[in-house]
């Protein structure tokens, strides 16, 4: 059977339990929100195919358990990931502080050139905010990682986040292909300006 996509990207969602990883994934894959999800046991995944620069990209997105007892299972999935989203809850200071630990996990278990992004989730609950947007931006800047605030419930920036991560992965792949093509060959992939890595900070506004 003919392949229905041009690229397959494996993405991973990591972060403390209860930060809304499953809700973010469900919003992106099903365009729906369910506030009654129980904590993910081990690992689960969803698939969605998107189009970027005229190419069909199949995203295989793995949702990991945040609890310590599942850590051995979930770290095994880091290795093949091409993109990792680190999620914290803006109403939970501890989940933000633990992002540094999650980054250490990535450094230990994931590929050195994996694309990363930090998501401050639940930005619709501004009255209970414990972590300012500026602190999220600074942490991301410290590690050279892109940052967005999201809300799975209000559907803020979820689509933007996945598309941005996928675009960065594709740009990196295209550059590698271009670098591997013989000198003078026309077989290399041409990088268009909008594919180049850009720093994107999206303000969380509930309309």
From Swiss-Prot:
GO terms for biological process: autophagy; axonogenesis; cellular response to insulin stimulus; cilium assembly; endocytic recycling; exocytosis; Golgi organization; neurotransmitter receptor transport to postsynaptic membrane. Its main location: membrane. Its EC number is 3.6.5.2. Regulated by guanine nucleotide exchange factors (GEFs) such as RAB3IP/Rabin8 and RPGR which promote the exchange of bound GDP for free GTP, GTPase activating proteins (GAPs) which increase the GTP hydrolysis activity, and GDP dissociation inhibitors (GDIs) which inhibit the dissociation of the nucleotide from the GTPase. Activated in response to insulin. It is a lipid-anchor. The small GTPases Rab are key regulators of intracellular membrane trafficking, from the formation of transport vesicles to their fusion with membranes. Rabs cycle between an inactive GDP-bound form and an active GTP-bound form that is able to recruit to membranes different sets of downstream effectors directly responsible for vesicle formation, movement, tethering and fusion. RAB8A is involved in polarized vesicular trafficking and neurotransmitter release. This is Ras-related protein Rab-8A. It comes from Bos taurus. The gene is RAB8A.
